[in-house]
Amino acid sequence: MIDFTGKTSLITGASGGIGSAIARLLHKLGSKVIISGSNEKKLKLLGNTLKDNYIIEVCNLANKEECNNLISKISNLDILVCNAGITSDTLAIRMKDQDFDKVIDINLKANFILNREAIKKMIQKRYGRIINISSIVGIAGNPGQANYCASKAGLIGMTKSLSYEVATRGITVNAVAPGFIKSDMTDKLNEKQREAIVQKIPLGTYGIPEDVAYAVAFLASNHASYITGQTLHVNGGMLMV
């Protein structure tokens, strides 16, 4: 049984489907949750479902000062889940420098800052769990998403490097790479598009946000204390590595 009673977790991108599912599960398992994102209205709606033992922290990850301040506000941090990310899709020949930079800045650089600042706190207590949410496309690539794929591949490389650096300090650093997870975005696909994607998934269905949340909870738990520097793929068999 996973029990996070007495632990404090920070979840970024908590206003989205996957982020909110992670926050709800960690909260259900006993953790105090700090839910962060840029959409205060959605964060408040999530908070209403949690009822207690939570804190809302509105943060714009494009602002590096806000990234640093987000961690500094937390006196005791046990679990960090870096889930926030953006897309700005177009073919590489049409992609402007700023389209590439803004995705890298939020999906990779901001998450590096959060990891770095969290590690500083976790080293003091010689305990910590960091989970970075990557993507199937960080391994497989995807046309029209050179910026997004680069950012998600970078997260995996960063996760491995950091796991080496802090392994002797009681801190584990892992990644979760979701495949196609049911969301508002997938709901907008037409039936033909949905069927084409499902045909590529051996389990024959989209995942749900809770599938990712349970993977995160496992990696954050003591059951995964001997696992670090790894990427847990949650994709229904769409990519087997």
Swiss-Prot record:
Endpoints of the signal sequence: none
Catalytic activity: a (3R)-hydroxyacyl-[ACP] + NADP(+) = a 3-oxoacyl-[ACP] + NADPH + H(+)
PROSITE patterns in the cross-refs: ADH_SHORT
Chain residues that bind substrate: 135
Gene: fabG
Protein known as: 3-oxoacyl-[acyl-carrier-protein] reductase FabG
One GO term (biological process): fatty acid elongation
General function of this protein: Catalyzes the NADPH-dependent reduction of beta-ketoacyl-ACP substrates to beta-hydroxyacyl-ACP products, the first reductive step in the elongation cycle of fatty acid biosynthesis.
Organism: Rickettsia typhi (strain ATCC VR-144 / Wilmington)
Functional pathway: Lipid metabolism; fatty acid biosynthesis
